[in-house]
């Protein structure tokens, strides 16, 4: 298992995520959709079918997808060197409420060390000091930042919907949920300002 940093994309399994996306997703999807990518990773058995399936690979993949999403949000591009320059073809990156919720739940389960059938959370165990049991502070901070940003994305999305749609539809929870669903169907990125 090779790793050269604290990020999920800085290990061999993260490169596997990038290779799958490069070969099977990006060529046909200039606008990347986080929900579609999650489904592709489930099909490729890089993510579990549900949260009860706990594995190092699944956890690393969830973190890698969150890292990719925020790399796009921060830079407006995905910066990976491939001869074909396939990543330059990406023009957008969308995320539905469900996709954000999926990653938030997966990463929160990691933080809370929800155990696998062997009683551990392998990805956390790998970052623990054998003597003290302390989780590597830099890795834990990175995980917490991803969780905080996913949570903020969900909140910003809800605020956008309430701000721009609340007056038109009366602001009831059912109406706002309908608007959220319709916004997800548009496949457009929701501005956060």
PLM ranges: what are they?
Residues 1-25, 192:
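Short, extreme N-terminal segment that most often corresponds to the first beta-strand
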Residues 10, 54-58:
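Helix-start/N-cap signature of alpha-helical segments
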Residues 23, 43, 67-74, 109-112, ...:
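Positions within ordered alpha-helical repeat solenoids
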Residues 27-54:
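Short amphipathic alpha-helical segments and their helix-coil junctions
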Residues 33, 57-64:
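Residue-level detector of well-ordered alpha-helical segments, enriched
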Residues 63-125:
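Amphipathic protein-protein interaction modules
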Residues 103-171, 179:
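Low-complexity intrinsically disordered segments
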Residues 176, 187-193:
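Short acidic DE-rich linear segments
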């Amino acid at each position: 298992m090779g790793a050269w940093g604290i990020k999920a994309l800085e290990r061999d399994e993260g490169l596997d995520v990038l290779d799958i996306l490069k070969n099977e997703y990006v060529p046909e999807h200039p606008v990347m959709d986080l929900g579609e990518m999650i489904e592709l990773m489930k099909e490729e058995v890089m993510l579990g079918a549900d949260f009860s399936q706990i594995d190092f690979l699944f956890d690393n993949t969830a973190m890698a997808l969150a890292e990719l999403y925020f790399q796009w949000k921060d830079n407006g591009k995905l910066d990976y060197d491939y001869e074909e320059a396939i990543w330059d073809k990406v023009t957008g990156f969308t995320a539905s409420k469900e996709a954000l919720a999926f990653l938030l739940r997966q990463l929160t389960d990691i933080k809370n060390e929800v155990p696998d059938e062997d009683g551990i959370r392998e990805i956390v165990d790998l970052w623990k000091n054998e003597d003290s049991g302390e989780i590597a502070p830099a890795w834990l901070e990175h995980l917490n930042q991803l969780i905080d940003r996913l949570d903020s994305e969900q909140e910003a999305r809800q605020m956008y919907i309430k701000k721009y749609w609340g007056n038109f539809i009366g602001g009831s929870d059912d109406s706002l949920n309908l608007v959220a669903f319709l916004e997800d169907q548009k496949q457009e990125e929701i501005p956060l300002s």
